[in-house]
Amino acid sequence: VRIVFGTDSDSALTRAVLDALEERGHEVKQVAAGEEWPEVGRAVARAVVSGEAERGVVCCWTGTGVTIAANKVAGARAALCTDAATAEGARRWNDANVLSFGLRLTSEDVAREMLDVFLSTEPDESERAAISRVEAQS
């Protein structure tokens, strides 16, 4: 899977996330390195919406800022997740295309669990009509 990754902080967790993605065989591109959260969120979302990447992963201290910025891009569906069940539901029921999380409270193990389910879960086709209504609002 082609993944675009962005963060406004270089930390042990962000490096572990990049390592986990690459270890799992994903093609990973990091964008907006060194930029602040508004640019990071937008850059990740634009890469996903344009088709440059299939999914995005974005993080900042709380995860809130990058999520808001990403969701300003038409066609982006960024979901701020705190655990694997939420990440799975975001894909299954909402067809989220960007996984967002905060660096403040997310452990490396939880980040890896969220990545695994977010990248392996497909949308539930019974939700397609609802997802289309959200897309029409863009």
Set out the residue ranges of the language-model regions.
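Short active-site oxyanion
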Residues: 2-3, 52-56, 75-77
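Hydrophobic residues within alpha-helices
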Residues: 17-18, 70
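Mid-chain, well-packed structural core segment of small domains
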Residues: 58-59, 64-104
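Charged helix-capping and loop-helix junction motifs
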Residues: 39-42, 81-83
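A short beta-strand-loop structural module common to alpha/beta enzyme folds
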Residues: 27-38
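Short helix-loop-beta junction
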Residues: 18-28, 75
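C-terminal binding/interaction regions
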Residues: 4-6, 10-13, 17, 84-138
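Short, structured active-site "lid" loops
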Residues: 40-69
